[in-house]
């Protein structure tokens, strides 16, 4: 088992350092990211593509990389009532890349193992509920296939890898006991490092499941759009179990209590009332950013009303991972130009809701 801090020196140069809570300025995140991608694409537009080498072998768990031309899309389908749809055939799907319909391969529905990075926000705001997280994760791990692997990262003042890839639930349980709380939240750094370091050694489907309020304290070097790009490059689906609603309830109750007191008490607590209102605004913006982050990667945002609900929430994520479709296609666009390509998946039932990532980066030269 590897027990080390993830290498912080592999982050971007310090010129990218951001101010506290600057992630709140990133909405709408997807528009900003797509503008950056478009700028990159314009710079590469005149580059001549390299020929595709012959004889590339594609193993069962392969996803798009420099060494393969086949693209794998993890796809979740829900009906109009929100229930998982698990019985579709290949003929029920249509896949589009940059608006152009693609042909699915014969291997469109094969079962692919999933490598899951479990991440926990161990900052002071979550310290009192780590036992609930440990219990929920153990239940989650028990519901995965024996072929699936798990790694564990905690983030606060530091981003720390507590458990490298393992199929051992015993090792995971031991690592969960080693989570100790810190003070601050390096959320963006944690996403970047999970994508570029941990998922670089993953196979099959890639998933990140994180418990957090999504509020980065701005003490790292990574912006939220940088983290999103890294997730898309790693072809990771992110599921966020957000405690924003739990924190919102606490702040609203305190704010309502203060506002209901006498005018003299309201004046006396004016600073605290202002802090609570600003805290609610920060939670709202953070939640919108988390919703865009999960939507862009084909994941899902969960907002349990109490930490007692974590067991059920993580069980729901495990259920979704067990019933994802793995759709494979070989792009009609053969250029190896490293550009971002938007994808869209539809089903023959218009009322179905299909979730997958917004696109992928083509192989480079």
Where are each of the predicted segments found?
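N-terminal secretory signal peptides that target proteins for export/translocation
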Residues: 1-21
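Compositionally biased, intrinsically disordered/low-complexity regions enriched for serine, proline
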Residues: 4, 17, 25, 46-50
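Bacterial N-terminal signal peptides
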Residues: 23-35
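Cleavable N-terminal targeting peptides that direct proteins into the secretory/outer-membrane pathway or into
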Residues: 15-17, 35-40
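Scaffold/interface architecture of coatomer-like assemblies
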Residues: 39-365
């Amino acid at each position: 088992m590897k027990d080390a801090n993830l290498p912080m020196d592999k982050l971007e140069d310090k010129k990218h350092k951001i101010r506290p809570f600057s992630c709140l300025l990133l909405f709408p995140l997807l528009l900003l990211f797509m503008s950056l991608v478009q700028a990159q694409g314009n710079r590469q537009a005149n580059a001549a593509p390299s020929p595709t080498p012959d004889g590339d072998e594609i193993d069962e768990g392969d996803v798009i990389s420099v060494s393969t031309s086949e693209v794998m899309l993890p796809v979740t389908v829900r009906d109009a009532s929100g229930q998982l749809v698990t019985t579709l055939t290949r003929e029920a799907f249509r896949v589009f890349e940059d608006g152009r319909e693609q042909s699915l391969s014969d291997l469109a529905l094969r079962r692919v193992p999933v490598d899951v990075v479990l991440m926990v926000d161990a900052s002071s705001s979550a310290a009192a509920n780590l036992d609930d997280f440990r219990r929920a994760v153990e239940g989650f791990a028990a519901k995965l296939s024996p072929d699936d692997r798990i790694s564990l990262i905690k983030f606060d003042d530091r981003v720390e890898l507590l458990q490298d890839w393992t199929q051992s639930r015993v090792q995971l349980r031991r690592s969960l006991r080693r989570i100790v709380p810190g003070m601050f939240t390096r959320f963006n750094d944690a996403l970047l490092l999970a994508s570029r370091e941990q998922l670089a050694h993953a196979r099959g489907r890639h998933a990140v499941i994180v418990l957090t309020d999504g509020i980065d304290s701005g003490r790292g070097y990574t912006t939220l759009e940088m983290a999103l790009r890294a997730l898309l490059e790693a072809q990771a689906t992110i599921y966020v179990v957000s405690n924003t609603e739990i924190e919102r309830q606490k702040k609203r109750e305190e704010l309502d209590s203060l506002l209901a007191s006498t005018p003299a008490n309201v004046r006396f607590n004016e600073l605290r009332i202002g802090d609570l209102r600003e805290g609610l605004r920060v939670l709202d913006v953070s939640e919108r950013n988390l919703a865009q982050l999960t939507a862009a990667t084909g994941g899902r945002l969960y907002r349990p009303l109490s930490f007692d609900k974590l067991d059920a929430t993580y069980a729901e994520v495990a259920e979704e991972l067990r019933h994802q479709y793995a759709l494979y296609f070989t792009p009609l666009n053969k250029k190896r130009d490293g550009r971002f390509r938007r994808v869209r998946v539809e089903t023959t039932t218009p009322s179905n809701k299909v979730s997958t990532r917004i696109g992928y980066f083509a192989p480079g030269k």
